[in-house]
UniProtKB/Swiss-Prot annotation:
Entry cofactors: Zn(2+)
PANTHER family tied to this protein: CHLOROPLAST PROTEIN-TRANSPORTING ATPASE, SECA INNER MEMBRANE COMPONENT OF SEC PROTEIN SECRETION SYSTEM
Domain of life according to the entry: Bacteria
Positions that bind ATP: 87, 105-109, 524
Family of the protein in this entry: Belongs to the SecA family.
Entries under SMART domains matching the protein: SecA_DEAD, SecA_PP_bind
Protein name, per record: Protein translocase subunit SecA
GO MF annotation list: ATP binding; metal ion binding; protein-exporting ATPase activity
Chain's gene name: secA
Annotated compartments: Cell inner membrane; Cytoplasm
UniProt GO cellular component terms: cell envelope Sec protein transport complex; cytosol; plasma membrane
PROSITE patterns the record matches: SECA, SECA_MOTOR_DEAD
Function: Part of the Sec protein translocase complex. Interacts with the SecYEG preprotein conducting channel. Has a central role in coupling the hydrolysis of ATP to the transfer of proteins into and across the cell membrane, serving both as a receptor for the preprotein-SecB complex and as an ATP-driven molecular motor driving the stepwise translocation of polypeptide chains across the membrane.
Complex and partners: Monomer and homodimer. Part of the essential Sec protein translocation apparatus which comprises SecA, SecYEG and auxiliary proteins SecDF-YajC and YidC.
Originating species: Methylobacterium sp. (strain 4-46)
């Protein structure tokens, strides 16, 4: 009560913050006459003048007012658009590293030009992040005209560019691209072997469009680059065939947590089925040697119980294509990892692609925290303000609309069954269509959007192809003549290519558009239709000239008339139905279910009522909807019965709205906790990733890594001596034979250690010093023999490739550790602390292994003179998603050189350095020449077995 009174008197904290920007807005407005008086050349020269001020020591804050005034005037001249005062405030919020929440249609794209231009003057590059390639191209070309007018360069990063094109785009003052492309470029850069091959030039400032979609919805989506491993398609097919034979009591399914597990009877049943099928040949299912079968069974079970065709994925062109749960978009090329995608392929009887191993990964949370300054824009951020502040240290500022919002958001209508709900939706669409009011029907999946489409067809409606010009002419003619067309369009992942055009024309009189979640669509729905889209479609072949201009003017007049018709399409008052006032015209949003997040619902509603236009929205629900069914449908059902709800009757009541809001808040809180938990664990890996990537970059930047190589060699000597001559041990306790053998194996040295140990009064320090000297002399002779310049090149390549190989193995180990560490909680130990501790020990082990591997290789390497050529990443990648977190991955193709499958450790005589100059000579009969052999490599003895099953069994490495 007191808080509400104080808010009324003093305003909210958001109001006070917005008020704080007003003086600078006034200062920018005061400069407008001066800017208008400048010639184009003089206005363009403002950029060089402002850059000079920054170079002279002024901060960007100091030049904000003149910079914003410059951009505003340039936009007026180039685009014919003038930044409103509230847009100037939005630009200031972005510049300060905050999130500007701006309603749909308020011009977020134009707002970004202000902060982008200002920060580009510092010369460190600005990254503008969008959700798809279409928006990246559109915004770069559209706003790039303003930047180009002012003398700044604009680049675009989209899928399919080569490294040279990417490097050129990143070198521009301003770069537009998608979150995936930026993240994968970062990972790929940290797999390069020369600084000159890297494409990104740093992470100074990023503006993230649809920031909630990228930093919240996709926060649990680690970007992963992976390489292929062994093909197990036969096993997937065999196990998939058994899934339909399981009974419902064989497994426990939790839809709320999206988990499924076999019951005790289910374990017995599946074991019996596996034996019948010849898959389980020996032992019990949970014996250690059958753990792979358990993994495949679990993934097949998940594929059949948790994932639904046309909701979670579609099948197209012999592929399983994932559907983004938040936007309804197809994600071609992305794949679930850990074998889940292969299980789905087996389920759908399409070609099964090979599994993959992680080579490099990072979450969006940690990628975007690399930027020195981060900002974002969206229409819906306030519901997630706490998460933005806690995770990213980003404050949310709600920017006032330029005109008041005139949309009417009606209360939800709740029905007992889905059938009753859909009948009410069709009836409502019928009524709106008869009034020529455009309707946008929002659904949660392809399956449901196509169900609505099928119902409409049963009621006499026909689907409409928006790319068919003659079909659209029918719609436009009907609008001109005041007729109804009974046509509708469907926008879902199946019609991805037509997306922008379908959305743009959803405001035509009488239009019916059925769409999966609208988050991140990025195209405004203008009442009456979209002039630019119609001109592009109808006048594509008409050359510039009077005729074209006349037709453009005619289209504008027609759309103005259509707009007036839409504005007048509201529903009149109906006192008999209890509605005393009329409902507005404009775009009518019909929601067919509530989403798990209030933010997604708000995004759907926000498609209507842009820039002060009238509009209305209403959600139709049933107790069979996913949200209602999973989160408290029993309680809700009882509530409806108490309220006297009969079959076929809807109810509208504040209790219902509150219960739904609470259910959504529960889901949001659960998802927030999951994202925080992912971040806590990923922070452990992220700290190690930073160390490895920074060290790697240092190695590449150094002209020579000889000093590092020498230190590593000395470290190996110290480790070997410490291992065989314990501290404070008597000489007779020394393992001299073991020391000599280890020195031969790891340093390729033959030294008289036994004779040294017999010398009177000799200490372990003396032996260590002699071994260091012998190793240094042996290596110096190798350098002299092969040439110092060539050895310097080989040293760097061996160091980088060894680091990459060990880091890949380390990622796999950490992933396995993370999967099982939760069991420590049973022993009353904190799994996170246990993970941190063990990950630290593993990282120390990685450092030790790096010393051994680099030293062992270089102490044996022989050079055959060939033209050196630095290894590079293969050109083709495929993306992958984690089954639980929705992880993004890039997979390298089979047979892709040093990054492809197989190979294990560095047997790079024929593999990793074959294109360079280093060749390692291994004698099959002399194990001392083998160096470090990967556990899964073919044994160098020539037996044909893997090393771990041959000589590795005796070396202690297996």
């Amino acid at each position: 009560m007191l808080g509400a009174i104080a808010k009324k008197i003093f305003g909210s904290s958001n109001d006070r913050r917005v008020k704080g920007y007003r003086p600078r807005v006034a200062a920018i407005n005061a400069l407008e006459p001066e800017m208008e008086a400048l010639s184009d050349e003089a206005l363009r020269a403002r950029t060089d003048a402002l850059k000079a001020e920054v170079a002279a020591g002024k901060s960007l804050d100091d030049i904000l007012v003149p910079a914003f005034a410059t951009v505003r005037e340039a936009a007026k001249r180039v685009l014919g658009q003038r930044h409103f005062d509230v847009q100037l405030i939005g630009g200031m919020v972005l510049h300060e590293g905050g999130i500007a929440e701006m309603k749909t249609g308020e011009g977020k794209t134009l707002v970004a030009t202000l902060a982008t231009y200002l920060n580009a003057l510092a010369g460190q590059g600005v990254h503008v992040v969008t959700v798809n390639d279409y928006l990246a191209r559109r915004d770069a070309e559209w706003m790039g005209r303003v930047y180009g007018f002012l003398g700044l360069s604009t680049g675009i990063i989209v899928h399919g560019l080569d490294d040279a094109e990417r490097k050129a785009a990143y070198a521009c003052d301003i770069t537009y691209g998608t979150n995936n492309e930026y993240g994968f470029d970062y990972l790929r850069d940290n797999m390069k072997y020369e600084l000159g091959q890297m494409v990104q030039r740093g992470h100074a400032f990023a503006i993230v469009d649809e920031v909630d979609s990228i930093l919240i919805d996709e926060a649990r989506t680690p970007l992963i680059i992976s390489g292929p491993i062994d093909d197990r398609s036969d096993l997937y097919v065999a196990i998939d065939a058994l899934m339909p034979r399981l009974a419902r009591e064989d497994y426990d399914l939790d839809e709320k947590q999206r988990t499924v597990s076999l019951t005790e009877s289910g374990n017995e049943h599946i074991e019996e089925l596996l034996r019948e099928a010849g898959v389980l040949r020996e032992g019990d299912l949970y014996d250690a040697h059958n753990i792979t079968i358990v993994h495949h069974v679990n993934q097949a079970l998940r594929a059949h119980t948790l994932f639904t065709r046309d909701k979670d994925y579609i099948v197209r062109n012999d592929e399983v294509v994932i559907i983004d749960e938040f936007t309804g978009r197809m994600m071609p090329g992305r794949r679930y990892s850990e074998g889940l995608h292969q299980a789905l392929e087996a389920k759908e009887r399409v070609t099964i692609q090979p599994e993959n191993q992680t080579l490099a990964s990072i979450t969006f949370q940690n990628y975007f925290r690399l930027y020195k300054k981060l900002a974002g824009m969206t229409g819906t951020a306030s519901t997630e303000a706490d998460e933005f502040q806690e995770i990213y240290n980003l404050g949310v500022v709600e920017i006032p609309t330029n005109r008041p919002v005139e949309r009417v958001d009606e209360d939800d209508e709740v029905y007992r069954t889905a059938e009753e709900k859909y009948a009410a939706i069709i009836a409502e669409i019928d009524k709106a269509h008869a009034r020529h009011q455009p309707v946008l029907v929002g659904t949660g999946s392809i399956e449901r959007s196509e169900h609505i489409a099928a119902l409409l067809e049963r009621h006499g409606y026909r689907p409409l192809d928006y790319s068919n010009l003659s079909a659209m002419e029918e719609v436009y003619a009907a609008a001109r003549e005041g007729r109804v067309t009974k046509r509708f369009a469907v926008l879902n992942a199946r019609f991805h290519e037509q997306e922008a055009y379908i959305v743009a024309q959803a405001g035509v009189p009488g239009a019916i558009t059925i769409a999966t979640n609208m988050a991140g669509r990025g195209t405004d729905i203008k009442l009456g239709g979209n002039v630019e889209m119609r001109v592009a479609q109808e006048l594509a072949e008409v050359p510039e000239g009077p005729e074209r201009q006349a037709r453009v003017d005619a289209i504008r007049r027609e759309i103005d008339e259509n707009r007036a018709q839409v504005l007048a399409s509201g529903e009149p008052a109906d006192p008999e139905a209890g509605r005393k006032s009329a409902l507005p015209g404009g775009l009518y949003i019909v929601g067919t279910e509530r989403n798990e997040s209030r933010r997604i619902d708000n995004q759907l509603r926000g498609r209507s009522g842009r820039q002060g236009d009238p509009g209305r929205s209403k959600f139709y629900l049933s107790l069979q909807d996913d949200l209602m069914r999973i989160f408290g449908s029993d309680r809700m059902d009882g509530m409806l019965q108490k309220l006297g709800l009969e079959q076929g009757e809807a109810i509208i009541h504040p209790w219902i709205n509150k219960a739904i809001a609470k259910a959504q808040q529960k889901v949001e809180a659960r998802n927030f906790d999951m994202r925080k938990n992912v971040l806590k664990y990923d922070n452990v890996m992220n700290d190690q990733r930073k160390v490895v990537f920074e060290q790697r970059r240092e190695f590449m930047a150094q002209e020579s890594v000889r000093e590092t190589v020498d230190e590593m060699r000395h470290g190996v000597v110290d480790d070997v001596v410490a291992q065989h001559i314990p501290e404070d041990a008597y000489p007779e306790q020394w393992d001299v034979a073991g020391l000599r053998e280890a020195i031969g194996a790891q340093l390729n040295l033959d030294v008289p250690v036994e004779d040294w140990a017999k010398e009177e009064g000799i200490a372990d320090e003396e032996i260590r010093d002699r071994l260091r000297k012998a190793a240094d002399e042996g290596y110096a002779a190798r350098v002299e023999r092969n040439g110092p310049d060539l050895m310097a090149y080989v040293e760097k390549q061996v160091l980088l490739q060894s680091l990459d190989h060990l880091w890949r193995e380390h990622l796999v180990t950490l992933d396995h550790l993370r999967q099982v560490i939760g069991w420590r909680g049973i022993a009353q130990r904190d799994p996170l602390n246990e993970y941190k501790s063990e990950a630290f020990e593993l990282f120390n082990g990685l450092i030790g292994s790096l010393r051994e591997q680099v030293t062992g290789q270089l102490m044996r390497i022989e050079i055959m003179m060939q033209e050196p050529e630095a290894p590079s990443l293969p050109p083709m990648f495929a993306q992958h998603l984690d089954p639980v977190t929705g992880e993004n991955e890039f997979a390298l193709p089979q047979g892709s050189g040093s990054f492809g499958g197989g190979g294990g450790a560095f047997g790079y005589a024929a593999q990793d350095l074959s294109a360079d100059a280093a060749v390692l000579e291994r004698d099959p009969t002399d194990a001392s020449t083998w160096g470090r052999v990967g556990r899964n490599e073919p044994c160098p003895c020539g037996s044909g077995k893997k090393y771990k099953h041959c000589h590795g069994r005796f070396s202690g490495e297996a």
